[in-house]
Amino acid sequence: MSKEIVLEDHAFLVSETNEKGIITFASDDFCEIAGYSVEELIGKPHNLVRHPDMPKAAFKNLWDTVKDGNIWTGYVKNATKNGDYYWVYATVYPTITSEGTKGYLPCRRKATSEEIQKAINLYKTLQ
């Protein structure tokens, strides 16, 4: 049975992906919480940490938002390498380099228990 991993108050999980969602950078906090080494994450799709409880509609909204060049925020339940899970409040920034290369910068912090409960209730309506 999986268990919830509760982030430390100071934890700040950062990653970068290319336009197709392939991880190009993973912070130490992200690696530690997700249970992967940086080498295991680089080059893999970011949905590697997607938890099956997350409704597809939430990620459709995320992708539609950032592909349009807008910032997305929301609560996400992610899966760890060993099958546990953790909740985050995520902000995903669309990025573009000076060379014109597009990508995304997801930044995540600890979600409070109240925020998590609201997200659970909302996501039940989207299943």
Label the model's feature ranges:
Residues 3-125:
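Sensory/regulatory domains in signal-transduction proteins
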